[in-house]
Regions:
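C-terminal-of-GTPase-core extension/linker across diverse P-loop GTPases
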Residues: 2-14, 143-265, 282-284, 313-456
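Switch I (G2) and immediately adjacent beta-strands of P-loop GTPase domains
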Residues: 54-74, 254-282, 298-303, 307
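Glycine-rich, N-terminal phosphate-binding loop of Rossmann-like dinucleotide-binding domains
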Residues: 89-91, 241, 276, 308-311
């Protein structure tokens, strides 16, 4: 995974703005920049100190195209750990692209997605967990999500993972020495000592995994489907949560046929929301297709919001939806509170773990919906200042480590040889160090950075 070329990319959004930034990184970054940049001081950037700024002009094919400020960073004290130059120029889309073109013509190669952060990882500036959180911070859509990502960048998650890993590594090293050098005077670890270490590691990993599940609604969003029979107010609720008219609302049953999707934020809860066709038996071919799509979409939902018309008695279609939600993470919304309730709300309450009454039309009850959602998703007790897992990859590493720790404890309890216990413990270490990147293969690293945008 060695990086030898000098790369460049636009580091700001592809839109007009106050400034645009073109970033260059690599062994020849300063030499490339000198080919296109002329400082008003008359001195080349090759003579510049690190952490210095220089005003001048950028030229393309010998013709000045913009004024810019060149920021020079010397290895290893840069974001990537390499020599880096950043041109801050005027933020017009055309101008920024021309500056990049000049840099590429001067010898730099186009940077791939996340390549600058990938180089920071490969050069030891950050670990893999911190690298992932850079993208999490960029994509954060709420205060808590941003706080979690920043705390991970600051190293809180890595600190917790490394603490667990090192405690197990110490055990593995001692067990290996005791097994491999029986003639040496190496004290055997007692079963109680091993159990204490493994138990503490298991508790910490279970806490991290639990925190991920509770914080998922904050950091990643929850795949959520709104379901109900026709004309109970599903689309009105979708529009209320979206803050705009995403779904068509009429008095005609069966208006919604396609699945309408929108990512919305309810308080600090991020929902990947889907409004589906009203579920009912129908002879309309197009509507029936929409109903089937709704049922398929429901099958993979992480959260179901079941909407009922409070102004009408429960129907067979309502009962079918109630039965479907049994055993699933679901929230009952009894809508049209502004019209007064006729339906059996006590029965609905008895069938759902979470329940709220509101008027999607007037937004009455919206605050209660936010509170109930937070309780249901576990975000009401979520502490964004604590170290937290921020990706499925990190969670999977912790789950694998936890499984190995449980196997080690089971082996210890059954009285097998300590070298067998050591094998299980070492598997846990492998999983934890894969999380931080110390033992991550090239395929894992490439997958992480493929999700980044170009320029970061």
């Amino acid at each position: 995974m060695e990086q030898t070329s000098t790369v460049a990319a636009i580091a700001t959004p592809n839109a007009a703005g106050g400034i645009g930034i073109v970033r260059i990184s690599g062994g020849d970054a300063i030499a490339v920049a000198d080919k296109v940049f002329s400082a008003v001081s008359g001195k080349p950037l090759s003579e510049a100190a690190g952490y210095s700024a220089h005003f001048g002009t950028v030229s393309l094919d010998g013709k000045p195209i913009d004024e810019a400020i060149a920021l020079v960073f010397r290895a290893p004290k840069s974001y990537t750990g390499e020599d880096t130059v950043e041109f801050s120029c005027h933020g017009g889309v055309y101008i920024v692209r021309q500056v990049l073109r000049a840099v590429l013509n001067a010898g730099a190669q186009p940077a791939g997605p996340g390549e600058f952060t990938k180089r920071a990882f490969l050069n030891g500036r950050i670990d893999l967990a911190k690298a992932e959180s850079v993208m999490s911070l960029i994509s954060a859509q709420g205060e808590q999500a941003a706080s979690v990502a920043f705390n991970t960048i600051e190293g809180r998650l890595s600190g917790r993972i490394e603490s667990v890993a090192h405690s197990i590594i110490n055990v593995c090293a001692h067990l290996s020495a005791w097994v491999d050098y029986p003639d040496e005077d190496i004290e055997e670890l007692s079963t109680d000592e091993l159990e204490k270490t493994f138990s503490a590691a298991q508790s910490e990993l279970e806490s991290l995994i639990s925190g991920f599940e509770n914080g998922k609604a904050v950091t990643q969003g929850v795949d959520t489907v709104i379901v109900g029979r026709p004309n109970v107010g599903k689309s009105t609720l979708m529009n209320l949560l979206s803050g705009c008219e995403r779904s068509i609302v009429t008095d005609v049953p069966g208006t919604t046929r396609d699945i309408v999707e929108q990512t919305v934020r309810v308080g600090e809860n991020l929902l990947r929301l889907a409004d589906t066709a009203g579920i009912r038996d129908t002879d309309n071919k197009i509507e029936s297709i929409g109903v089937e799509l709704a049922k398929k979409r429901l099958s993979r939902a992480e959260l179901v919001i079941a909407v009922f018309d409070g102004a009408q008695k429960l129907t067979d279609e309502d009962m079918e939806i109630i039965d479907f939600c049994s055993g699933r993470r679901s929230l009952a919304v009894v809508n049209k509170s502004d019209l007064g309730f006729v339906c059996n709300t006590d029965y609905i309450k008895s069938r759902f773990g979470a329940y709220v009454e509101l008027s999607a039309k007037t937004a009455q009850g919206g605050g209660e919906l936010e509170k109930v959602l937070s309780d249901l998703l576990g975000t009401s007790n979520f502490d964004p200042s604590a170290a937290a897992l921020t990706s499925e990859r990190q969670r999977n590493c912790c789950v694998r480590a936890l499984d190995s720790i449980k196997e080690a404890r089971s082996a210890l309890e059954s009285g097998v040889t300590l070298d067998a216990v050591n094998v299980c413990a070492d598997c846990a270490v492998d999983a934890l160090l894969e999380l931080t990147g110390e033992r991550a293969g090239e395929a894992v690293v490439n997958e992480v950075f493929s999700q980044f945008c170009v320029g970061k």
